[in-house]
């Protein structure tokens, strides 16, 4: 340290002018041989050189700012030097390149969870039907019926994920997305038929009261049902799997906040919906367990069994009504409930060089896949800008409003000339 200080004082005394010291970034960093000749400590990879010749110095700005050093490839550190964490964080993978692979992995995890849930639902639904039949309990069988609705929903979700990877054919140019809607209609109709049969039996038991229930089997089956639904809740719960991976960027980076920060553990709506259904099943199973406990220890209150059937039938009807309504809207090619046609028209009219929006038709191929056909008239004299208008309208429909497909027809505005139909003239008095 003493030798280094003496060297600095000697260099200051020998300076020809009062110009400030500067770093010479035009020389290579590896000067270990020169350092040894001058008696300085050797640097393995880097040595800062103090230049005396003012001609080598960068031009000093008049405003007193720090001089800007020009980039020089020769001034980089040797490759075997370890990089710091901040240097490593600047190497960012493009989110656009990995988003497709990430989506595939996400769908694979969703399919695995839903498949396991479907298998458990199927096995226990069969077990409940057998247990309810042996125990002569309509409440147990109604609980199995409610589980059938959840099983159908999971199967439809898996079907939708499978169909999304299928390409359209020459006959089915839109693909096979409507198959999901058809399957939903069939499954709901099957549930309603079974529910009608159970309600009829419940009414007969309420009127005649000539039936016996095996309280032990009913209690065991109901207890297993609660346990299975708790397991389903843990299986489908995603709160413990949320973790955000963000690509590290410096705070002043122009790309920060521009979409490179993603939540890689984003929840799946399909799994979340199945989790909500599992919670509903858990509540219903607890109700069946309470009824089984009452019937087991108080057989004279066996009326609790048909009462549970009435309550759970209403619950099944309530949960399936939305499916029926959405299916009818899709079949009739109605506008999806989350889209507003007037608002979309206003947004299209705000595009530059758009004169009017003549036709706007919106419908759904299936749940979550909306399609639009729009006819736009351009301002007279702006036909040369049709590509720009089409690009903006396409981006608005697909990205802003989340359309699955859209078709845009462009036409220059032409004032209509009143023409009287010859048939109308001949028929008029």
Swiss-Prot record:
Q: Please list the residue ranges that the record places on the Lumenal side of the membrane.
A: 135-143, 200-216, 296-310
Concerning Pfam families, the annotation shows: Cation_efflux
Q: What is the effect of changing residue 404 to F?
A: Decreased homodimerization
What function is annotated for this protein? Probable proton-coupled zinc ion antiporter mediating zinc import from cytoplasm potentially into the endocytic compartment. Controls zinc deposition in milk.
The protein's organism comes out as Homo sapiens
Key words of the record = Antiport, Endosome, Ion transport, Lysosome, Membrane, Metal-binding, Transmembrane, Transmembrane helix, Transport, Zinc, Zinc transport
What's a BP term from Gene Ontology annotated to this protein? zinc ion transmembrane transport
S-S bridge residues: none
Among the GO molecular function terms of this UniProt record, one is: metal ion binding
Question: Which reaction(s) does its UniProt entry say it catalyses?
Answer: Zn(2+)(in) + 2 H(+)(out) = Zn(2+)(out) + 2 H(+)(in)
Bilayer disposition of the protein = Multi-pass membrane protein
So which stretches are on the Cytoplasmic side? 1-113, 165-178, 238-274, 332-429
* Region: Zinc binding, residue numbers: 240-264
The family classification in the record reads: Belongs to the cation diffusion facilitator (CDF) transporter (TC 2.A.4) family. SLC30A subfamily.
Q: Which residues cross the membrane?
A: 114-134, 144-164, 179-199, 217-237, 275-295, 311-331
Q: Where in the cell is it found?
A: Endosome membrane; Late endosome membrane; Lysosome membrane
Q: How is it modified after translation?
A: Homodimerization through dityrosine bonds is stimulated by oxidative stress.
Keyword flag Cell membrane: no
Q: How does it assemble?
A: Homodimer; dityrosine-linked. Homodimerization could be specific of the human protein and enhances the zinc transport efficiency. Interacts with TMEM163.
Mind telling me what this protein is named?
A: Probable proton-coupled zinc antiporter SLC30A4
What is one cellular component GO term in this UniProt entry?
Answer: late endosome membrane
Which residues make up the binding site for Zn(2+)?
146, 150, 277, 281
* SUPFAM superfamilies found in the cross-reference section: Cation efflux protein cytoplasmic domain-like, Cation efflux protein transmembrane domain-like
The taxonomy runs: Eukaryota, Metazoa, Chordata, Craniata, Vertebrata
Q: Its principal location?
A: membrane
